[in-house]
């Protein structure tokens, strides 16, 4: 487990946070995915940066070892749902963006499944304990949903939303 006093942070912020182009992109992502702050974007960027770094380092390995590790990395990203196809290549990993990671957050998937009317309501339902994955309550909107868990997302069994879900109306999935 490790010593709790020696924990590392999961993200690395920008070296210069006030670049105008990046500010605009970050604001769009915050609105599109209902994020609370830019740290959540930086976590996604760091995760994708690490995956891309692993892919680049694989290119330097001998072909025999490279093929084994390449398959392992592709399988991991496929199980996480970040890669769409099981037979992806390193080029697909190198072309990943932070949006690929943000699409796999529990908050986004709850909204896209229609369990919440808005992306912000999805965040609130999760933090208030109304959402479960295979019957287990998950209260972190940033939880990365694995491909196998996606169909198991539902309301928590004792949640009042289980019997009376929020009225759906028109949910525009393309806009969010």
UniProtKB/Swiss-Prot annotation:
The keyword Glycoprotein does not apply. One of its GO terms (biological process) is ribosomal small subunit biogenesis. Gene3D superfamilies: RNA-binding S4 domain (3.10.290.10). Pfam families: Ribosomal_S4, S4. The keyword Methyltransferase does not apply. GO terms for molecular function: rRNA binding; structural constituent of ribosome. Signal peptide: none annotated. Residues 104-166 form the S4 RNA-binding domain. GO terms for cellular component: small ribosomal subunit. Part of the 30S ribosomal subunit. Contacts protein S5. The interaction surface between S4 and S5 is involved in control of translational fidelity. HAMAP family: Ribosomal_uS4_A. PANTHER family: 30S 40S RIBOSOMAL PROTEIN, 40S RIBOSOMAL PROTEIN S9. Belongs to the universal ribosomal protein uS4 family. This is Small ribosomal subunit protein uS4.
